């Protein structure tokens, strides 16, 4: 009984404990209420943040949707404009139809190859159990040779594997289209088609890279030029197809660029050489056109005195070189023509070879007049071109000496006249150059000093006539007379030139004075004008 009472006392709480519990309960109630209020506030804040984030995301999605719609609309408009612009050409329409047909065929082939390869992969582990791997090396090699598929199958396997790998990764354009489809359900069909097309492009683009670089090297330049001359494709899908179907032809491009650079360098070099020779030829022709009388006289003299001895010919050449006669023109012309022929024959291009084949006209000597005598014919027969030596007779030589000497004297006189004429032309050119340099905008020396120039020309003509008369009197002593006359003429020319230079210097000084006076007057007027304002 005592035990029962003790247990009841232990189980029943005392009055003090009950009072403590009752006091603690009202203290715990406000703490729990505060915790619940804080939780509610935190939940409300979280909900508000989520609502704001969702609103921002929704706005961004709407903006992206609008942008994608605008882009698609613009691409559609561009495609329509291109079709309208190129719709009149039936050839372009036919090409587009062919491309679409090829595209569908390639799609079907790729699908069939993928199915076959998938079936083979499923059957492969059944046909070849794992026990084969434990065979020795020789058996393993033989079995590998026996089991080895053909090169075409290997290529297909590689292709399918590459396409399968690419199925996992998609380009940025595809991801964009998928995002548009998520945002707007109207674009679902278009994006699916574009995904299929892009997968096929990846497969077709991987084919040439798997085959190796041999096919790239085998391609010719002709194929490259045709590929470059093809018309541009219209529409975004066609552009993607063209970009995917183009093989990586970096090696061939480098070769092609090198060949083009070498051909252009050769063409430029040939053009420079031809320009040089043409400039020489034109300058010589212009000189010949400026003095046709000199050429005629030179040709007549040469036809008359063609059978002279070698020493006299050398003397005439020396005198011609001193006086700048047309022989220099002929020699330079022949030299330029010979070099031009050599260059054109060395060239590798058939166009220039055809030009070189045409024979350049060789400047033949002026034919002898109809009134030539038998003695002149005999003299012409003595020329080195004839190659025949007629029988020498003393009587004929004595008879032929008199007219020959007379002709020689005439030729020397004509040579002197030509020389004087050339010197006069040179002086005129110098004077013109000096006049152009010292020309005033309102005054020209040619107008003011025309009378003086005419008087100088008349004086020169008189001097020439006097020299010709003095030369015609003495025939035997021609070489010493020629040298003396050339010295006298040189001295006279130098005196005239010095006098002309002095006159020009005086004219320049006068013009400078006039110019300074004009400048002073202009300055004074300027100062007056500035003072007035």
Swiss-Prot record:
Residue numbers spanned by region Disordered: 1-40, 84-176, 286-333, 370-399
Q: In which tissues is it expressed?
A: Expressed in mature spermatozoa (at protein level). Detected in retina, lung and kidney. In brain, highly expressed in brain-stem, cerebral cortex and thalamus with lesser expression in cerebellum and hippocampus.
| Inducers of expression | Expression is moderately up-regulated 2 days after intracranial injury and increases at 4 and 7 days post-injury.
Domain of life, per UniProt, equals: Eukaryota
Disulphide bond pairs: none
Q: Which residues form a coiled coil?
A: 40-72, 416-531
Compartments, record wording: Cell projection, Cilium
**Cellular component, GO, one term:** motile cilium
Its keywords, alphabetically, are: Cell projection, Cilium, Coiled coil
Query: Which segments show compositional bias classed as Basic and acidic residues?
Result: 107-126
**Cited PANTHER family:** ALMS1-RELATED, CEP295 N-TERMINAL-LIKE PROTEIN
Official protein name in the record: CEP295 N-terminal-like protein
Which source organism?
A: Mus musculus (Mouse)
